[in-house]
Amino acid sequence: MQQLNKISYLNQIQSQQFDVELMSEEVGFTLDQLMELAGQSIANTVVQLNKEGKSYNKILVLCGPGNNGGDGIVSARHLKQFGLQPEIALFREVKNPFFNRLLNQCKYNLIPIHYELQDLEKYDLLIDAILGFSFKPPLREPYDKPIQQLKTTKTPILSVDIPSGWDVEQGNAQDFFTPQYLISLTLPKLGVKSFKGRHFIGGRFIPLKLQEKYNFIVPEYQGSDTILELSNL
């Protein structure tokens, strides 16, 4: 477990610039690679919670239109391969060829895909991958209703990178839902610094040259682990 005050936090501009640099010709990552690594980290977090005694078997992954949603779709495929029962909730038809490839992978893994609101209480765990660090208010259709559902549900929630609707720098400024769990990707965002739930981090791939260039304080993963729990001590 790593202390929260011994790690770098990113604001919105830094988060966006860092993604761009990772996928630059010089650094060489592709969006496919980054989503695969992120999705596996999300799934590994669920596995870790189950190892501790939770019974998160039937899981709904709520996915938005951006990279956060793509991470969620990939996580569903990994969860299925891990023997769990994920389902995906999208809230509009997907026209992006890249996303459709990810969805086809899930269809071939027999993962149910929904395009309408679901009864959240019939699931053991919800994965919130609706909106990411690029979100700017106000909430718009069709994502306003599922995010309101997350505020009232009794089913535990694992948010991806930042809870949907939160400001990447100011946090839950508009009083949206607060999840029980959070998995930050690469480095945590400023807006989750005061998060009180269980906070994990994944995305163990920050190149050493970029760590030095930006003077990042990065997570101290153990052995071959791909996730790490952060402590607020």
Swiss-Prot record:
It comes from the Eukaryota. GO terms for molecular function: metal ion binding; NAD(P)HX epimerase activity; nucleotide binding. GO terms for cellular component: mitochondrion. It catalyses: (6R)-NADHX = (6S)-NADHX; (6R)-NADPHX = (6S)-NADPHX. Belongs to the NnrE/AIBP family. PANTHER family: NAD(P)H-HYDRATE EPIMERASE. Catalyzes the epimerization of the S- and R-forms of NAD(P)HX, a damaged form of NAD(P)H that is a result of enzymatic or heat-dependent hydration. This is a prerequisite for the S-specific NAD(P)H-hydrate dehydratase to allow the repair of both epimers of NAD(P)HX. This is NAD(P)H-hydrate epimerase. It comes from Paramecium tetraurelia.
